[in-house]
Amino acid sequence: QVTFLATQEKAHAFFQRIHLAVRPVRNAMIVGGGAIGFYLSQELLENHVRVRIVERDPERCNVLAESLPEAQILCEDGSNREFLLSEGLESTEAFVALTNIDEENVLLTLFAKKHSQGKLVTKINRLEFDDILAGLDLGSIVYPKYMTCDYIVQYVRALQNEAGSNIKTLYRILDDRVEALEFTVHEKSAA
C-alpha cells in the first residue's frame, strides 16, 4: 500500500513526472439532467468548468436553468447526433452520458469517442454486464450502486478517523487497485 499526500500543485507535478497525463478539464457536455448530472454540474461549476447540460424534459430544463444559472441548459434529445455535433461535441474536453438508459449511455459514449478527444464518463445502472462493458473502452464507467457503497465506506472511515470531518471524497481508480482520499487540512491542524 502506498500513501501519497500532496497539495494540488505538487500532485500535478508528481503525475507529470511519472508520465501520467492529467489535463484539467475546462468544459464539459453532460447528457442527462437528473440528480447525478445536477450535482456533478454544481461541482464542475465550482471548479470553473464551463458546463452544458443536454436534457430532453422541458420541465426539468426549467428547474436546471433556475438552479444552475451558470450552466448552459440545452433542451433537446441527447441522442440526436447532429445536435451534439452542432453544440461542439468535437471540442468538448469531457463528455458525460448520464441518461437513465444504459444502452443509450453506451451508444452516446461510443459516438462521443469517435468525434471527440475529451475524457469520457458513462453511467451504467445494471451491474450484470460490467465484464462486457470493460472491453468497450467507455472511459470512466460510473455505477451509481457502487457510488452509494463508496459514500458509505467514506462515512464509516470518517467515523473511525478523528479528523474524519475533514475527509471530502474517496476515489477508487485503476480498477479499484488504488484508493485516493481527498481531505482538507486546516491551518491549525497538528503537523
List each language-model region with its residue ranges:
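Cytosolic regulatory regions of ion transport systems
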Residues: 1-191
